[in-house]
Amino acid sequence: MNRRRTMLLLICLCATFCLMTQLGAANVVLMGTNLTLSFDDVEASFAPGVKGSGFEGVVYTAEPLDACSPLTSKAEKGPPSPFALIIRGGCTFDEKVKNAQDAGFKAAIVYDNENSGVLISMAGSSGGIHIYAVFISKASGEVLKKFSGHTDVEVWILPAFENSAWSIMAISFISLLAMSAVLATCFFVRRHHIRRDRPRIPEAREFHGMSSQLVKAMPSLIFTKVQEDNCTSSMCAICLEDYNVGEKLRVLPCRHKFHAACVDLWLTTWRTFCPVCKRDASTGIPDPPASETTPLLSSAVRLPSQSSSFRSSVAASPPRPISRRPSSQSISRIYAASGTPNSPNPIRSFTNSTAMSISRSNVDLSNMSSRPRASHLASAHSLVGSHLSPPINIRYASPHMSHSGYASPSPHVSSSYVSNSGYGSSSYYLGSSSQHRSYLRRCGESGPSLSTMAPQSPQQSQLRHGGESDLNLAGASSGQSFRQSYLRHCADSEVNLAGASSGQSFRQSYLRHCADSDASLSAMASAQSLPGC
């Protein structure tokens, strides 16, 4: 419809322009019976212009034809008005018109003597000229000459629009307006065609939806019957259709169900939230299984975060000491086996007893800080009557020294090798077997005293005593069998405990024992350069 209106407007503008141009050029019109001819003319600049609706008359040929001399033919008076037809040349235009005016003619029509096709504006003196004068082409003059003297054929000289200033301005304005309208119409038509023929470019959305892999990772089910009572249990909220048996439904993390095709299209092309509750559907979706198209960067980025979280959890958890409290039956069984003369493997029994002693020493040290002094004294009396309780030397043996003592003969017998046990005490390997025996006996006698007589700093005493027990084990493994050392140590410990409990107080026995130990250690230090107990 728009295109048709545009074409109609163009046709009307062209017709108007042509009509105005035709009216401006048709100044001389020949009208007869069944005959109408129009000719272009240009009015003379020295003659008055045609006014009103025009001027009517009958054309007559001038004699002489060039009208350079007074005319011999006289114009007839009365209507219609006579017009003189004159050829160009021979004299000036104003002379020709002057001679025609003097002969009684009301208008002078001058035609060209050559077929140049160019109409000129006749110039000359306007003094004394009162009739109309126009200039036409040679062809137009030849046609008018044929109808000369015919009173039944009228000739009209019409006013030319281009001859007035207002007419020129109006024609110029109308022409400019017509050209602008044509150009604007062409521009809009061209623009309309470009918009219609150009392919539609989809507008860029602010949100691009979820990937198809994440959508397919959501759980789905086959509809059988309505099992829940909610807005999406029987009807899809997207297409508003009821579920049919056998249709595939997609379950979002918010537990709302939809047709798989409907919700997949919604999540991948429009939004990532549930159409019903507006909850984000991308939360709570597990990662899809790895495939050939899975990018390697995701796994590489995920591993450091997992390892860092593991380290942080390990660092945040406090260290927990692991200590096992063996039952009394197992302790009795172990020491009974180690004290039997027919024991087939003394090394294995020593291993079991040492391991058990280490665990018990851990328990004793952890409980020592909370025990009062009276509890230490009570434990001393219980140790006197117990024949199967493990010796103090073995109870506080360090794990490092026990492994080097019973597994194999120590490779560091001839050197002073220092090792730090778990409790911060230092143990030493001695060079000679005689010094081993004296030093071990002294340390063995000090065992019960350290465990029963509570000094002012019980924990430091027990830690130092652990180092002495390590020396006992090392000396026993290198000088004599573990069985003999163990039996003699038990006997010495019981004698010391009995004497201390019957003769004097525990504190005095402990002080005397420390003095004896310091004296023997100082003598040994001068011989072997060993540190004190």
From Swiss-Prot:
GO cellular component, one term: cytoplasm
Carbohydrate-modified residues: N34
Gene3D superfamilies the record matches: 3.50.30.30, Zinc/RING finger domain, C3HC4 (zinc finger)
Keywords: Disulfide bond, Glycoprotein, Golgi apparatus, Membrane, Metal-binding, Protein transport, Signal, Transmembrane, Transmembrane helix, Transport, Vacuole, Zinc, Zinc-finger
InterPro entries: E3_ligase_sorting_rcpt (IPR051653), PA_dom_sf (IPR046450), PA_domain (IPR003137), Znf_RING (IPR001841), Znf_RING/FYVE/PHD (IPR013083), ZNRF4/RNF13/RNF167_PA (IPR044744)
Residue ranges annotated as Lumenal topological domain: 27-167
Cytoplasmic side: 189-533
Name the UniProt record assigns to this protein: Receptor homology region, transmembrane domain- and RING domain-containing protein 1
Start-end of Polar residues biased regions: 448-463
Region annotation (Disordered) ranges: 309-329, 440-476
Compartments where located: Prevacuolar compartment membrane; Protein storage vacuole membrane; Golgi apparatus membrane
Record carries keyword Transmembrane: yes
Keyword field contains Nucleotide-binding: no
SUPFAM superfamilies, alphabetized: PA domain, RING/U-box
Entry GO MF terms: ubiquitin protein ligase activity; zinc ion binding
Signal peptide coordinates: 1-26
Positions annotated as zinc finger (RING-type): 236-278
Function: Involved in the trafficking of vacuolar proteins. Functions probably as a sorting receptor for protein trafficking to the protein storage vacuole (PSV) by binding the C-terminal vacuolar sorting determinant (VSD) of vacuolar-sorted proteins.
Disulfide bonds: C68-C91
GO biological process: protein transport; ubiquitin-dependent protein catabolic process
Transmembrane stretches, start-end: 168-188
Top-rank taxon, per record: Eukaryota
Principal subcellular localization: membrane
Cross-referenced Pfam families: PA (PF02225), zf-RING_2 (PF13639)
CDD domains, per database record: PA_C_RZF_like
Residue ranges of domain PA in the record: 84-145
